[in-house]
Amino acid sequence: MQAMDPAAADLYEEDGKDLDFYDFEPLPTLPEDEENVSLADILSLRDRGLSEQEAWAVCLECSLSMRSVAHAAIFQSLCITPDTLAFNTSGNVCFMEQLSDDPEGAFVPPEFDVTGNTFEAHIYSLGATLKAALEYVAEPTLEPRLSQDLEALLSRMQAEDPGDRPDLESIIALCEEKLQLTSSCRVCRSLSAVGRRVLSIESFGALQDVSESSWRERPAPGNAGPRRPPGDPSTDPEVLPTPEGPESETSRGPRASPTKALLSTPVRNGESHSREGLAGLVLDAERTLGELDRDALRRSRLRKVQTFPRLLSDSPEATLCLPLTRGKSQLPISELFSPDPRKAFLDRKNGLSSFQAQPKCRLWPEQEPEHQLGRVPCAGRSTDRGPGVPGSPGQPETSHPSQGPAEAPADPRDASGEAQTPRDDERIPEGARQLESAAAEQWVSLQDLLSQLGRPFREYELWALCLACLRALQTRPEHPAYLCLDSVLVAEDGAVLFQPPPANGSYDSFFLAPELAEERLVTEKASVYCVAAVLWTAAKFSVPRNHKLALPRRLKTLLLDMARRSAPERPSAAEAIKVCGSYLLQRGMDSRKILAHLRASICQVYQEEETISLQNAFSVVELKPSVAPAPEPSPGFLPVNSDTGLVAVPGPVPGQHPCGEEATQLPAAFTSEATHFKPIVLAQNASVARDQPALAQEESEERGGQREGEGEEKLSLEAHAGSPSLKTPDGPVPGPGPQGAAPEPLGASVQRDSAQGRPCPPPQAPANQPEGASSAAPGSPVPAPPTKASALPVEQGPAEPIPPGVASGGLRPDALGPTTAHHGPRHPPKPPRSKATERPGQEPEGPGATPAGERDDQSPDSVPERPRPADRRLCLPCVDASPLPGRTACPSLQEATRLIQEEFAFDGYLDNGLEALIMGEYIFALKDLTFATFCGAISEKFCDLYWDEKLLQNLFKVVNGQASPSPSTAEEAGSQLEGSQSPRSPSSKRPSLHRLGKEKPAMARTSSRAPCSPTSVSDVDSDALSRGNFEVGFRPQRSVKAERAQQPEAGEDRRPAGGASDVEAVTRLARSKGVGPALSPGPAGFQSCSPGWCSAFYEADCFGADVHNYVKDLGRQQADGALPDAQSPELEQQLMMEKRNYRKTLKFYQKLLQKEKRNKGSDVKTMLSKLKGQLEEMKSRVQFLSLVKKYLQVMYAERWGLEPCTLPVIVNIAAAPCDTLDFSPLDESSSLIFYNVNKHPGGRQKARILQAGTPLGLMAYLYSSDAFLEGYVQQFLYTFRYFCTPHDFLHFLLDRINSTLTRAHQDPTSTFTKIYRRSLCVLQAWVEDCYAVDFPRNSGLLGKLEDFISSKILPLDGSAKHLLGLLEVGMDRRAEGNPRGTDLENPREAEEDARPFNALCKRLSEDGISRKSFPWRLPRGNGLVLPPHKERPYTIAAALPKPCFLEDFYGPCAKTSEKGPYFLTEYSTHQLFSQLTLLQQELFQKCHPVHFLNSRALGVMDKSTAIPKASSSESLSAKTCSLFLPNYVQDKYLLQLLRNADDVSTWVAAEIVTSHTSKLQVNLLSKFLLIAKSCYEQRNFATAMQILSGLEHLAVRQSPAWRILPAKIAEVMEELKAVEVFLKSDSLCLMEGRRFRAQPTLPSAHLLAMHIQQLETGGFTMTNGAHRWSKLRNIAKVVSQVHAFQENPYTFSPDPKLQSYLKQRIARFSGADISTLAADSRANFHQVSSEKHSRKIQDKLRRMKATFQ
């Protein structure tokens, strides 16, 4: 080890326990919020608590600081916690005024609510903080050993009685005594050293405008850092592969390389280079290319606890550089953290990340990649290595002596190569250390883009740019203060990234928000201003100055709003995104595709190396030779969770292939030095294509898991634009794109090639791997291990991260780490809509043109984005997706686009093909419509064009020319692979996950049911589509045995349809793990199977793109790369943490609220407003995470969906014939009737909608794919009582289970397994959602189900045990009478974090303030006494019913002194409103949507008295015809709700008419009107309408108090009437705007029942006996809002005493006759003056008259 020189030693001694190896020049200035490092940060980074000496020092410094802030404002608002106790830049203790990180109140003194903040209170908090810091991360068995003095001090500081705590002076004296030999300042400064540098690095990595020059380091001459054990294989250079093969740069002569090689800095001052690999840092969960580009800053910032490696215990401030190999020096931290976020972090799987050393070489992503032979680089980038060079990520490599400096990837997404430095004995000439020039840039600035375009952006391009910029802005944690055309970069896939502003510091004030000129804080709206300026400049580019900018009004208005001078007047980024998104959505455009098309259209690549081009639609391929043999397989490195160590594992390194074999297999031209840089043209050989049987055979072998040397004689060419690799015999030959274009992320990869008429074939897997497991793709040097999952290319870009469906190791542009044997499959990605298409007239490739590279499981469309499932069980041809443009195997779409271009391409219209593409896709989506509807849809959509009838006929024939296969052909096709090159309708294409939402309106999503429907015959002509609907019959057609023989098992030959990309992934996840039905995690493992109300209301749009993106992000964080299940630990942990954050924030908010009431301080008010916003934000995050959890649960159920063509099996599967089923209403022929129309014109489209069905058919449809996802199951559970009883439904489900139970366990992949599993899911969803309304009131139902589960299911399938638990919990909950807020999801969980969030909100508010509320106040005397009426309190007893139960029920409350209506005046409007709301909410939470159905049969009528008297309700309901089946016993809870509403209305009227003075009546009228106003403003429409009903009583309206009521108060009555009209106007008026998701709501039960009665009017059945599902679906949507409103409870603090009194008063007047009560009160009449009183007045007048005389 080289010793330190004296100067360095002195430096370290002076600096304390600083980083051991490097001393940096002054770090950049930190933002204000990061100048302080908190104690929590330090503890997290050290991963251990404070030592005793440190505790004494911190205690002393805190005490001194506390004394200095005694008169500051922070003294009153401070709560000392590990988060608020911080150290400033000088190491001094300071306090931060931020939200207390106190989940359990451990740091809050017990007397806080009484005394507020005092010295004693702060001493308590300080003691608790020090105690927690000392015990931080202590082993459970190892208690921290503290001295007796420190223990005693901390104990006294935390004494319950403030008087027992030591005073500040005594604490200071004791601490100074203990620190006589040590400086407390020095200890604190040393303590904060690690956090100081980390935060500085964090801030620096996040600040894009910091120049590189300020990031210089001065390495110490020696290395004194910690070392690995000598035998540690992870650090031993001998076990590392020694790459050989590629020639060194110097041997080739000087030339410009497409990549910027990573060259070491010149040797300075005797510094030596190390040959060790780059140190790794443990990063947070895996991040992808899409996230890195879209959210570079936030993703690049290291987080506190989970981010940093555990530092050595003997050196708390140990360096963050942990060596992987033994050497003499380590890399400086500055080389690990790049100033620019785009090149900062190379995230790895399992959180392991490596960074490229970059002394003076910046790793900009604009550099052109060098493509290589035999290795797939990340994101299309590679180093100059031979095929045998190990390129696996996480594998340090050293340079060969003759190789020269090793090259490093030039993009943050390239994690394939480790940073390398020359060995000590290899000195590189100074000239060789200069950077090589980049041949092209992957990112293009807007300035360059506009310059090369030579024109301003068009309208739709501006909209797309605006949306992309705003999305990029919204995802950044720190908002850019300055944007210009040079700082906005556009990637090849259309992503937008903001780069730092110009280094020269020149700024154009035009792009700077006005408030920033005043040096205010950079806000989001300041950045919105910058975006508007950029867009304005782009729109006016090359337009003469004297010309007015001509923009459409809508766009111009948006830009002007975004550029308003006043920041508050500008729209937020979210609001502007909504406007832009709606514009593009209406036109079926994708912003990323538009920008990608622009980017591709101007991209001129200056290719320095000559390339090998493939003729006829193949991409240009660039290859490099390797003359040296490959080394033997070396141990690979696997990341170990959160530890920075690397563990060597035996076996070949993933992504490494035998090179010698490969070299002998390649043509000589590929390896010849003479021809390496000469173009080689390979003529396309039609014989390369394989026929279907061969593909099928290879597929079956592939499923076996091993493919050894199959087809070695064939050369497979991979023409993916971003896959520069040539694999072993059947590995693909990569190509960078036309003219050596830069590799593009998947999804934009066909842009350049297709723009030149050359669509790209898909990528191909390496030969030594099962092709189903992995696929060579851009940035995928890591093939997956053998697995049955398919490798699925995916659209990639910043706006859309890689979906978790991408197979492990396959198509991962970011190559986030070495794959392991544990990689699970991923769900299929969405097919991207590429902006490029083939040129008009270009003929698509036929089947014979398929290269060998397109293996068996390749899609028929020859496009990289096409999913390539290796397991043919996942390849059901009925699965649909949107059509992809530019496909070679989609002639219908190409021909339609060609016809459009020929007809309308004139005067520059349709010049770039984008408009024609969009129009073609839209028209292609209309293929299943009748000709008349087809013509009308086109003419209406594109009304600005003249559509000739002949053109429409041609288009109709083109799009309908290839009909869907019949069921028989579908079965045959299902057993084949999707590699067939025959044209196929979009019904055979995979659905998109994102098209489950509301995106991409022009992408038609044809029905997955179409290929299986009886009408879809292969030879049917277009006239067959003229029918408006079709019918699917479920009559018994064959025996079960015959059914099984003829119809392939759905689990084996089919893939779930209709948006089933996630379903498929979950299915593959289970299969890849070898989980059969007996071992498969049942629905219990997923906690819930109920789709929820939002499924019934929003149907397919329930889960938006944000949910899908989050699930994808979550999937990438899985250790095996698999889609997370519903019990994802990451999701559960995040949800738990968000709930805890909400709880502690709410507690803190409540404390501040109480403090504000006492002190009325302005500081507290400011804090309250901030906290309120944070609470709303936290609540929305929790709701979002809950929605994600629900999505995963729904996708579990979707694993078992069947195609409609297999639904007859469900009906005929029972051992007994269908007609023997004793379903009284179900013995007619069962069928389903669909409409042949488009369902979602604005998003995913569906050619067939279920219109009607017989009861048995509707129940069978529960088993169809997407039934859960599209809301059918939830809608069925709400409405099935109209056509069958719970007994019938249970019989149906149990019969399916009984018939499939045995067979499902015999064959885990069969259709029977799906039926069995889906039956359990539906049964669980029913029990979870409708237990209270169906099971208790239907005798024998519960017992039958329990007996069946115990006797039939549990012996064979133990996973069904949870169903019994649900039934038991349901009975317990019913007995307890708990409201819906505590649902059945987690019945036995007692933890707070497992409680439903809304119940948490409610209980937290109850616990928060009610326990600490002030003592009960006696009523204030306000002069309103009743002297004349005290003797006769009430003479109206005859008019009131006697509530005999009151005294027994309420106890002392009923005996309190009667103050009558006067008591109401003692309470504020808010108090009364909140308690009335809580009372109403308590009743509403117990109701169920089913309670509102069939209300007419209960006697609910549309009249003032909505509910009949109790005595007559039975007779009325008996007379009314019930819409339910006769033997269904209906729950009458709705009557209880309406009766309570009537009681409240009666109480309101009675309180007013029983008032004995007009003044009291005016007071009460005003009080009730203001309460009602508060109610409807807070969306408590139930109480508002009840009060309105009481005030509209005739006796109340005749009261003279109305005449003297203030005008402003009287106006409230008119507002209430307007609200009533609004509520009556529409049944879904309260669900508009989605604001209700964030606001509690209580609907008027009577008005909601009336709306449902209106929907129930009319017939439910058709002439053939089928029930109208469209009618039932509408009813289900309306009643679903009951559950929607129950999910958002009010969080007012309950006042039990006031509630008790209100209940008492309401019960007292229940059923009273208001007219009788009014007649007894003189205040209700106009008083006539008595004769005596009149005489007195006359006398006074007479005396006054005498005075004037």
Curated annotation (Swiss-Prot):
GO terms for biological process: cerebellar granule cell differentiation; positive regulation of protein phosphorylation; regulation of dendrite development; regulation of dendrite morphogenesis; small GTPase-mediated signal transduction. Keywords: Cell projection, Coiled coil, Guanine-nucleotide releasing factor, Phosphoprotein, Repeat. Pfam families: KIND, RasGEF, RasGEF_N. Residues 1005-1019 have a biased composition (Polar residues). One of its GO terms (molecular function) is guanyl-nucleotide exchange factor activity. Residues 739-748, 766-779, 980-990 have a biased composition (Low complexity). This is Kinase non-catalytic C-lobe domain-containing protein 1. It comes from Homo sapiens (Human). The gene is KNDC1.
